[in-house]
């Protein structure tokens, strides 16, 4: 289904954005989280300028996203390494099994 206009409140300001109906709940949750972050930042930094708070929050969110990307990349590399090790272990076990069964099979000629 196509995107539909949705009104959300961000730090006391109304904002209309287009959003697919199935993503409306996620959008509202994101707006709630942003509102909470802005409120926490306002209390913590004592900055009252909304624009400045939004920029600080955006920088914090971008930093957190960059950190998560690094963690995800590291995790994926670690999993690839583990999969390669498992493949090598399985291949080695199959080779060993093949050698054992070759010795154990009687040969009839």
UniProtKB/Swiss-Prot annotation:
Coiled-coil features, chain-numbered ranges: 21-99
Principal place of residence: cytoplasm
Assembly and oligomerization: Homodimer. Interacts with FtsZ.
GO cellular component: cell division site; cell septum; cytosol; plasma membrane
Family, similarity comment: Belongs to the ZapA family. Type 1 subfamily.
UniProt keyword terms in alphabetical order: Cell cycle, Cell division, Coiled coil, Cytoplasm, Septation
Location in the cell: Cytoplasm
UniProt-listed InterPro entries: Cell_div_ZapA-like, Cell_div_ZapA-like_sf, Cell_div_ZapA_eubact, Cell_div_ZapA_N
Cell division among keywords: yes
Protein name per its UniProtKB record: Cell division protein ZapA
Function recorded in the entry: Activator of cell division through the inhibition of FtsZ GTPase activity, therefore promoting FtsZ assembly into bundles of protofilaments necessary for the formation of the division Z ring. It is recruited early at mid-cell but it is not essential for cell division.
Pfam families: ZapA (PF05164)
One GO biological process term: FtsZ-dependent cytokinesis
């Amino acid at each position: 289904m196509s995107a539909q206009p949705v009104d959300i409140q961000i730090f006391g300001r109304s904002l209309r954005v287009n959003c697919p109906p199935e993503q409306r709940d996620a959008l509202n949750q994101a707006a709630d989280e942003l509102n909470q972050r802005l409120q926490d930042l306002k209390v913590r930094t004592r900055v009252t300028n909304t624009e400045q708070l939004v920029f600080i929050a955006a920088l914090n969110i971008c930093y957190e996203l960059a950190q998560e990307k690094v963690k995800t990349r590291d995790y994926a590399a670690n999993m690839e390494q583990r999969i390669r090790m498992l493949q090598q272990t399985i291949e080695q076990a199959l080779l060993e099994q093949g050698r054992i069964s070759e010795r154990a099979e009687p040969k009839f000629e």
